[in-house]
Swiss-Prot record:
Homodimer. This is Aspartate--tRNA ligase 2. Belongs to the class-II aminoacyl-tRNA synthetase family. Type 1 subfamily. Residues 198-201 are annotated as: Aspartate. InterPro entries: Aa-tRNA-synt_II, aa-tRNA-synth_II, aa-tRNA-synth_II/BPL/LPL, Asp-tRNA-ligase_1, Asp-tRNA-ligase_1_N, Asp/Asn-tRNA-synth_IIb, AspRS_core, GAD-like_sf. The gene is aspS2. One of its GO terms (molecular function) is catalytic activity, acting on a protein. The lineage of its organism: Bacteria, Bacillati, Bacillota, Bacilli, Lactobacillales. The keyword Nucleotide-binding applies. It comes from Streptococcus mutans serotype c (strain ATCC 700610 / UA159). ATP binds at R220, D221, E222, Q229, E477, G529, L530, D531, R532. Pfam families: GAD (PF02938), tRNA-synt_2 (PF00152), tRNA_anti-codon (PF01336). Its EC number is 6.1.1.12.
Length: 589
């Protein structure tokens, strides 16, 4: 029979109607001669009642055989419940079942289908189709669908054109590692799955499309964490003839539209902006979480003459103050915090506690000559705990920034109801790679340099600034963009600064350079991480919660066992050989 409606959509206005519902058995209970069944579908749960006095023997026997996750079809009259369940939207009604058909049986699930999951991540991914039945997961994907709907409507109204760009692209050396796809037709040649549609969307601007967007899959072979997946989705934008400010305004209004439609929150526009240098110096991060205070304080000038060489001879000495936290941390607990700063290069973590009008701790005796000024500058109050890092400025900023975020979580300083957006602007064009012993692009090699620093492309690369902008939400990089280079001469200078020879630049990017000979307009754009945005809107801490079939931390799918070995025949067709020892070693790990 045709389904009348979703089970979770039945309400008091349906009392007296005979309906047909279909879904899964969430629970079955036998009470006082009656059989009660919670029927679940994507909209929720409704209670079914099978009364042996009014239902046929066939219906009763079928009901007695039901187990969790059986798929059933039921028909019956909607009546008012004797005792309403205020925890359910359907809690004031129930169905008196007159017909019941088992559409499919189910084995006992490896975990109970409920919001408070009691399974580890790999088990959830191994049975993802069951995990996705949980109401919490369905809620996440309804949210995601609404977000994408709002985004498309907003961009369509602004005359952006939705264009699909190639999934089989050319591998380029900049950025993260590519996922490579061998070509059967061109022996020994490979496509790359795109890390972003960066170059193709720029070429669309050269084609005169003026405003492009795409909600697009991207791929990066990089180390994974809670906000990264090997394949992810971004909202990709590109425009012609617009300034940096105009692109930011379009983006802000897009985000404000999503926040209003999805969360009912009115954003105050324009969003705040801080420079990259300010972000690093004040928060120790290029994606600062501004939902709490605890900014970094520069004490380099204050300690330069004290009799403590660790401080006085350090290039930079910076501190953070954990307010009213001294009693929360024993010396042993503080020692463990060293593990937070060491990965950022810090050689140690110094600290003092402030109580009874004076500071105390392992280094307090070295600070007596500046104690009063230190207390005044840091605005210390009773029970405050101060942490110091003395090192190069970059190390001091990065390590204290990580500690700042760690302490905020431990001390419950974060207001999780807040959505704090801000722009980080005035970025360096290049960043130094210790691993490669050279400068690399902070964003990508197509970013337009700021006009007053472009001469440094042949000089001090650390002084080159980019017309680039990142949008940050609650300590996460939500997206980033820039104005792009549209002059061939500037693009060639950029490639040269990055270490490309003229020949290698032509080999990798000759098609782009050639396009710049044909009236390439000024252009710029931005990409927003859709998975990350939805994760934050849903209040989750891992983007796996908002991706239907994600990979685990080893970039594997426990359900399908991807990636997998392929047959020798498939490899032969692609003229490939596999290192058997590498495969054996990988299987043993």
């Amino acid at each position: 029979m045709k389904r009348s409606m979703y089970a979770g959509a039945v309400r008091s206005e349906h009392i007296g109607q005979e309906l047909t519902l279909k879904g899964w058995v969430a629970r079955r209970r036998d009470l006082g001669g009656l059989i009660f069944i919670d029927l679940r579908d994507r909209e929720g749960i409704v209670q079914l009642v099978i009364n042996p006095k009014t239902a046929s023997n066939t219906v009763v026997k079928s009901a007695e055989s039901l187990r969790s996750e059986y798929v059933i079809e039921v028909t019956g009259m909607i009546v008012e419940r004797d005792q309403a369940n205020d925890n359910l939207p359907t809690g004031c009604v129930e169905m008196q079942v007159t017909q019941l058909t088992i559409l499919n049986a189910s084995q006992t699930p490896p975990f109970e289908i409920k919001d408070k999951i009691e399974a580890n991540d790999d088990t959830r991914l191994r049975y993802r189709y069951l995990d996705l039945r949980r109401p919490e997961m369905l809620k996440n994907f309804k949210l995601r669908a609404k977000v994408t709907h709002v985004i498309r409507n907003y961009l369509d109204d602004l005359d952006f054109i939705d264009v699909e760009t190639p999934m089989l692209a050319k591998s380029t050396p900049e950025g993260a590692r590519d996922y490579l796809v061998p070509s059967r037709m061109s022996r020994g040649h490979f496509y790359a799955l795109p890390q972003s549609p960066q170059i193709t969307k720029q070429l669309l601007m050269n084609a005169g499309f003026d405003r492009y967007y795409q909600i697009v899959k991207c791929f990066r072979d990089e180390d994974l964490r809670g906000d990264r997946q090997p394949e992810f989705t971004q909202v990709d934008l590109e425009t012609s003839f617009l300034s940096e400010q105009e692109i930011q305004e379009i983006t802000e209004r897009l985000i404000a539209c999503v926040m209003k439609e999805v969360k009912g929150i009115e954003l105050q526009l324009p969003l705040p902006q801080i420079s990259y240098d300010t972000a690093m110096n004040n928060y120790g991060s290029d994606k600062p979480d501004t939902r709490f205070e605890m900014t970094l304080q520069d004490l380099t000038d204050l300690v330069k003459n004290i009799d403590f060489k660790v401080f006085s001879q350090a290039p930079a000495v910076k501190a953070i103050v954990a307010k009213n936290a001294a009693n929360s941390y024993s010396r042993k607990a503080i020692d463990k915090l060293t593990d937070i700063v060491k990965p950022f290069g810090a050689k140690g973590l110094a600290w003092v506690k402030y109580n009874d009008g004076k500071i105390g701790g392992p280094i307090a005796k070295f600070l007596t000559t500046i104690e009063d000024e230190l207390i005044e500058r840091l605005q210390l109050e009773a029970n405050d705990l101060v942490f110091f890092v003395a090192d190069d400025l970059e190390i001091a900023n990065g390590s204290l920034g990580a500690l700042r975020n760690h302490l905020a979580k431990e001390l419950n300083l974060i207001d999780h109801s807040k959505f704090n957006f801000l722009w980080v602007v005035d970025w360096p064009m290049f960043e130094w790679s210790e691993e490669e012993n050279r400068y690399t692009s902070a964003h990508h090699p197509f970013t337009l340099p700021q006009e007053d620093t472009v001469a440094e492309l042949e000089g001090d690369l650390s002084k080159v600034r980019a017309v680039a902008y990142d949008i940050v939400l609650n300590g996460y990089e939500l997206g980033g963009g820039s104005l792009r280079i549209n002059q061939r001469e500037t693009q060639e200078r950029m490639f040269k600064a990055l270490g490309f020879t003229k020949e290698s630049a032509q080999k990798q990017f000759g098609f782009l350079l050639e396009a710049m000979d044909y009236g390439f307009p000024p252009h710029g754009g931005l990409a927003l991480g859709l998975d990350r945005f939805v994760m934050l809107l849903a209040g989750k801490e891992n983007i796996r919660e908002v991706i239907a079939f994600p990979k685990n931390n080893k970039a594997s799918d426990p359900m399908t066992q991807a990636p997998s070995l392929v047959s020798d025949k498939q490899l032969d067709e692609l003229y490939l050989q596999v290192n058997k020892n590498a495969v054996k070693n990988n299987e043993q790990e």
